[in-house]
């Protein structure tokens, strides 16, 4: 029985397809892992959240060939390892309200699975109450094997050949020197805000940075920015019972040609806030020449509910 119009249009197969899970994960991983420095940042944050007192970052070829981060933190139980490699698997939050009570650097549960999706990754981890550890081997987001292994307490994550399965993205990475600089920036930012942790940074077998643990933020600042810089810093403190600020800012006697040495932290998380940058630079406007900027390290501590963390995949 006809109705005067062609029904074949409604029977045509759809051109829209739901992507396979591994393809979707690889695309999503590109938002979290932009370059080797993203891996360094995510793995260092995981190590810090694991209550580590020592963290070592080792790179080869600016992180293009190899990134290895190992710590002496809490480690993971064998049964937790495959779970940690799934997206949105995290021990940091359980419900939306927990976003207002976060005390850790990581919370989205995307670091390990995202890194695994775009590299060849090996994890070795062991908890204190176990005589042996667990080793997981992943390639392109697929777990190739999980086995028992001898290793110290803590976690070691080795990432090789980043973006080997995304050649176009790898092509747009910069030179080894540039990628190394990006990695160092994240290393120094995290090292600066966690003086009670010892850090090492090794590139192509050469120790570039070694920071001993200390309870003094000023000692860590000196280790990173230099003794001469520290002698030209003034201390500022503020505490109203809810918000606490500890700041170190340069005297007009020294300045920089860029804002690279302005470090702002909220609850030990490095942030870039235009209003704070503008306020700092405005303070120095009448004492520094045009095009010159101060050195400033600002640590702000607030209740977790006072600031909403950026929950995007590409959060920095």
Language-model region placement:
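Positively charged, low-complexity/disordered segments
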Residues: 314-316
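Short, positively charged and aromatic/hydrophobic N-terminal segments
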Residues: 8-9
């Amino acid at each position: 029985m006809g109705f005067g119009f062609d029904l074949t249009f409604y029977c045509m197969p759809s051109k829209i397809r739901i992507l396979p899970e591994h393809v979707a994960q690889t695309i999503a991983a590109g938002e979290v892992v932009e370059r080797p420095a993203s891996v360094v940042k995510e793995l260092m944050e995981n190590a810090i959240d694991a209550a580590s007192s020592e963290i070592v970052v080792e790179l080869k070829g600016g992180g293009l060939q190899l990134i290895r981060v190992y710590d002496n933190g809490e480690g993971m139980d064998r049964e937790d390892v495959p779970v940690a490699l799934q997206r949105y698997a995290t021990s940091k939050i359980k419900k939306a309200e927990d976003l207002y009570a976060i005390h850790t650097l990581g919370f989205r549960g995307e670091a390990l699975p995202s890194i695994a999706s775009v590299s060849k990754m090996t994890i070795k981890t062991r908890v204190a109450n176990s005589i042996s550890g667990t080793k997981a081997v992943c390639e392109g987001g697929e777990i190739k094997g999980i086995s028992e292994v001898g290793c110290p307490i803590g976690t070691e994550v080795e990432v090789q050949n980043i973006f080997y399965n995304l050649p176009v993205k790898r092509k747009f990475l910069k030179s080894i020197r540039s990628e190394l600089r990006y990695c160092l920036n994240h290393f120094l930012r995290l090292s600066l805000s966690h003086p009670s942790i010892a850090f090492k940074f090794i590139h192509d077998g050469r120790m570039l940075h070694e920071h001993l643990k200390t309870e003094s933020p000023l000692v860590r600042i000196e280790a990173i920015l230099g003794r001469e810089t520290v002698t030209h810093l003034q201390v500022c403190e503020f505490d109203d019972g809810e918000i606490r600020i500890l700041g170190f800012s340069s005297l007009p006697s020294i300045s920089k040609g860029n804002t690279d040495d302005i470090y702002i932290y909220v609850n030990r998380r490095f942030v870039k806030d235009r209003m704070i940058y503008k306020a700092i630079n405005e303070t120095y406007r009448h004492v520094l020449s045009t095009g010159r900027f101060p050195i400033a390290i600002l640590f702000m501590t607030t209740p977790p509910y006072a600031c909403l963390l950026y929950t995007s995949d590409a959060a920095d």
